């Protein structure tokens, strides 16, 4: 292990002792904001320090075993102990490096997930509906809530565009690598000749901003229009102008919300989505710069990149970023995404570890 990392771990151990002492003081709860901050820091430091303690114990065991090598009667036993200690040190070293990886401040946040139909017309819209169901079923498996924020339905079913809010601890950490182009290859229900068509959708996953204050929304930069909410095919479904369209003039971003019960609710939701989009745009710009520097395949934030193909005739799903192919399409479309998300997270961690080693 690098001396700089050992020094960092020693500093974290000292800091944990300091935080533990501060939390034990009678006046610790006088300032509840600071108390919560210290409690959170204690929870973050404890696992790192515990693993580091185990690492040092394993090093001590290795040193003891190496001393026994000089005793002819203990030589075989010592060799076994040395091998076991080295294996343990290697595993703990890897675990410590992962624990020291920079944390994404957005990982625990709720998300907005946008699915837009691309090339393929009605079939792309149907696939957008399938993707929304896939993410909704995945959310159910994790006991997260799903709310439809805005939906532009197509006449044959599915969505031209749909925005959902997924509420649950860690939603962003598990789904942030879903952003990008998703391609489907299958025989559409409307295809009489049985020919396979290729369609595409774009997915965008954005962490929900904690508060609107996270992004400064100057009223001068906003144009707010109201109109009547409409259903599939464009028919109006109410008689009041409850739907809201907000245009962010400096960037040209447009957000529409019409699924709320009132104009006020739709405006509030639209402002949240706009804040998330602006936050996300800033984050993607930074990610793209970092990714270019380290030639990253994961987490570049490039929405134009085709990241996954869903091939129905072959029953397979392929994630092109990590060359992962699974022959369990039905399960994946029913929300069984764990194998894919775990592999993407592992690859991202490997990239970060490689960057630490540079």
Swiss-Prot record:
Keywords: Cytoplasm, Methylation, Protein biosynthesis
GO molecular function, one term: translation release factor activity, codon specific
Disulfide bond annotation, renumbered to this chain: none
Compartment(s) of residence: Cytoplasm
PANTHER family assigned to the protein according to its UniProt record, in alphabetical order: LD18447P (PTHR43804:SF7)
Reported function: Peptide chain release factor 1 directs the termination of translation in response to the peptide chain termination codons UAG and UAA.
NCBIfam families per the UniProt record, alphabetical: prfA, PRK00591.1
Family per similarity comment: Belongs to the prokaryotic/mitochondrial release factor family.
UniProt protein name: Peptide chain release factor 1
Lineage of source species: Bacteria, Pseudomonadati, Pseudomonadota, Betaproteobacteria, Neisseriales
């Amino acid at each position: 292990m690098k001396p700089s990392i050992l020094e960092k771990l020693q500093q974290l151990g000292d800091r944990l002792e300091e935080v533990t002492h501060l939390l034990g003081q009678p006046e610790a709860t006088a300032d509840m904001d600071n108390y919560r901050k210290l409690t959170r820091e204690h929870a973050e430091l404890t696992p790192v320090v515990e693993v580091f303690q185990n690492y040092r114990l394993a090093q001590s065991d290795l040193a003891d075993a190496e001393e026994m090598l000089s005793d002819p009667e203990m030589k075989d036993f010592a060799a076994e102990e040395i091998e076991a200690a080295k294996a343990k040190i290697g595993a703990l070293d890897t675990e410590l490096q992962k624990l020291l990886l920079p944390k994404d401040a957005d990982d625990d946040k709720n998300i907005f997930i946008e699915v837009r139909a691309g090339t393929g017309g009605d079939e792309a819209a149907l696939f957008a509906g399938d993707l929304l169901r896939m993410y909704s079923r995945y959310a159910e498996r994790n006991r997260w809530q799903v709310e439809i924020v805005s939906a532009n339905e197509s006449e044959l079913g599915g969505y031209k565009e749909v925005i959902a809010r997924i509420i649950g601890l860690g939603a962003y950490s598990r789904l942030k690598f879903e952003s990008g182009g998703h391609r489907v290859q299958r025989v559409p229900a409307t295809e009489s000749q049985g020919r396979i068509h290729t369609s595409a959708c774009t997915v965008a996953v954005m962490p929900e901003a904690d508060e609107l204050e996270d992004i400064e929304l100057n009223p001068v930069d906003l144009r707010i229009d109201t109109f009547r909410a409409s259903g599939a095919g464009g028919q109006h479904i109410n008689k009041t102008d409850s739907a809201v369209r907000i245009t962010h003039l400096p960037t040209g971003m447009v957000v529409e919300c019409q699924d709320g019960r009132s104009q006020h609710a739709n405006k509030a939701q639209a402002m949240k989505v706009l804040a998330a989009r602006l936050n996300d745009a800033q984050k993607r710009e930074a990610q793209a710069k970092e990714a270019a520097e380290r030639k990253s395949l994961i987490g570049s934030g490039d929405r134009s990149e085709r990241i996954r193909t869903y091939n129905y005739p072959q029953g397979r799903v392929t994630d092109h970023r990590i060359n992962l192919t699974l022959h369990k399409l039905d399960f994946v479309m029913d929300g069984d995404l764990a194998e894919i998300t775990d592999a993407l997270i592992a690859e991202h961690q490997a990239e970060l570890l490689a960057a630490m080693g540079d």
